């Protein structure tokens, strides 16, 4: 029989790291034409769940999800059909559920969730605070041009601090009194010469970094009483803050910035490069060359990998730890237009989300490059930003003047189980 063409059987071992779903560790003979659907039926038959409810699994064959026939997958990987094949199965991540639509007066270009709050920034120059249940709490004015990025500095029951950046060439530090529901601009951060597209707060909340169309990366104090070195008395009294550090190296706009740890920053740029900066040395530690302008980049502390969003509809995976930094680990196909935003899950090692100009959000597993796990639909215009900081909620903002909130069923169930 011609197994490679789907005829005949393949010897497989079925493995799982979820011990309560383990099946006997013996070789099984299965048809080469099997797909995920047939493998699900086969494993569930072996398990014979006591409550009778089937479990949805995904199947990893040589570190990549099976998305077609097993024989085609093996052929693509140049794996011998004569060898016993190990197949790892994992419980499928449940589909996030649409929960809410938060309507604004203009494009929503920045979103960031924290606890029960959602912070948004808009093209009408305003910031807004919402509950994750969809209640509007506060509109904040101060910027004089569209807001491009926001991030929380600290948050407790009584107060919150956050930073926003704008096309008005500034970043602003804000203090929010939860009880009185009032927000005050503590400092206006000046130093960039063009719009400020990206902002990120350090893990300890003491500093934040900004990336701008002026190609500069700047690091600022996030402390309330620290206006920056060299700041004149007059500027301090007026609430103006200057940067602690300015780093030069990109040739075009810095579209993404993220703290990798307390002394390391990641930036992505329209100049087709990713750069890893060592702040203790005030210089570039690693540079990764890509073949497209980078619109967004996200680093995972769980797997140490970087995923990027670009102008060619694709997402790409990189490892900054290797000497072959320019080599793409994987390319993810699924969007039909520019991918504007991307972010790793903060709790799920292999999962990330993306938002694009095709009006769609997608939830991905980095081991499934051929297709996303789920399409998260709802936006009527292009997606401008996406956030998964709160494990329970995927939040996105778009040119349809709305924020879409999707609830992660797995995170909600896990939080209930720990109570």
Curated annotation (Swiss-Prot):
WD repeat segments: 103-141, 142-184, 191-230, 249-287, 289-328, 334-374, 378-416
SMART domains documented for this protein: WD40
Any Pfam family hit: WD40
GO terms, biological process: maturation of 5.8S rRNA from tricistronic rRNA transcript (SSU-rRNA, 5.8S rRNA, LSU-rRNA); maturation of LSU-rRNA from tricistronic rRNA transcript (SSU-rRNA, 5.8S rRNA, LSU-rRNA)
Keyword terms: Nucleus, Repeat, Ribosome biogenesis, rRNA processing, WD repeat
GO molecular function, one term: ribonucleoprotein complex binding
GO cellular component, as recorded: nucleoplasm; PeBoW complex; preribosome, large subunit precursor
Function: Required for maturation of ribosomal RNAs and formation of the large ribosomal subunit.
Protein name, entry field: Ribosome biogenesis protein WDR12 homolog
